[in-house]
Amino acid sequence: MGAYKYLEELQRKKQSDVMRFLYRVRCWEYRQKNVIHRASRPSRPDKARRLGYKAKQGFVIYRIRVRRGGRKRPVPKGATYGKPTNQGVNQLKYQKSLRSTAEERVGRRASNLRVLNSYWVNQDSTYKYFEVILVDPSHKAIRRDARYNWIVNPVHKHREARGLTSAGKKSRGINKGHLFNKTKAGRRHTWKKHNTLSLWRYRS
């Protein structure tokens, strides 16, 4: 068993005394720092490497905290101005994950970099903490690497804002495998298409 296998097993036993202590100490440390700050190295190297991180020039890790809880509808004092108030203001559930939100915020901060992926690192009662892997598209080490230079293409600018990262695809219902064709173009769209009786004038 290699070193990364051991690290993976440690992560699985989050309730062990050692890991609980480590999480508490790290959580305190992260709370003292800015909301978005650069990390010198990933706190979960095994996870970061599985998601594409390499300890070489051109790769950057940013750590971010996102407030937990639902998303309030952005209407001042609950004034919906013609929209039905009984559709709700407070107890709405945001359709995107907090990890996806974290990627978007880091992507806006470091707009010269490309978001590759992200992963959970910690949480407390108020916040969830994530680390986001970013790639510098103008760095020679990235541009010359055949495995990563696809991200240099301008079509991948702000991929996190368009739901093209792993976390973003999840909320869009995009995946591979059995029955995922049922979510193509959106779950509700597919349901509506299947449940709408269409009677064409000229039927074959």
UniProtKB/Swiss-Prot annotation:
Recorded superkingdom: Eukaryota
Keyword terms, alphabetized: Cytoplasm, Ribonucleoprotein, Ribosomal protein
CC per GO annotation: cytosolic large ribosomal subunit
Single GO MF descriptor: structural constituent of ribosome
Subcellular location: Cytoplasm
Keyword set includes Ribosomal protein: yes
Gene3D superfamilies reported in the protein's UniProt record: Ribosomal protein l15e
GO biological process, one term: cytoplasmic translation
InterPro entries: Rbsml_eL15_core_dom_sf, Ribosomal_eL15, Ribosomal_eL15_CS, Ribosomal_uL23/eL15/eS24_sf
Keyword Cytoplasm in annotation: yes
NCBIfam families, per database record: PRK04243.1
Assembly behavior: Component of the large ribosomal subunit. Mature ribosomes consist of a small (40S) and a large (60S) subunit. The 40S subunit contains about 32 different proteins and 1 molecule of RNA (18S). The 60S subunit contains 45 different proteins and 3 molecules of RNA (25S, 5.8S and 5S).
Protein function: Component of the ribosome, a large ribonucleoprotein complex responsible for the synthesis of proteins in the cell. The small ribosomal subunit (SSU) binds messenger RNAs (mRNAs) and translates the encoded message by selecting cognate aminoacyl-transfer RNA (tRNA) molecules. The large subunit (LSU) contains the ribosomal catalytic site termed the peptidyl transferase center (PTC), which catalyzes the formation of peptide bonds, thereby polymerizing the amino acids delivered by tRNAs into a polypeptide chain.
Family, per entry: Belongs to the eukaryotic ribosomal protein eL15 family.
The protein's name in its UniProt record: Large ribosomal subunit protein eL15
Classification lineage: Eukaryota, Fungi, Dikarya, Ascomycota, Saccharomycotina
Underlying gene: RPL15A
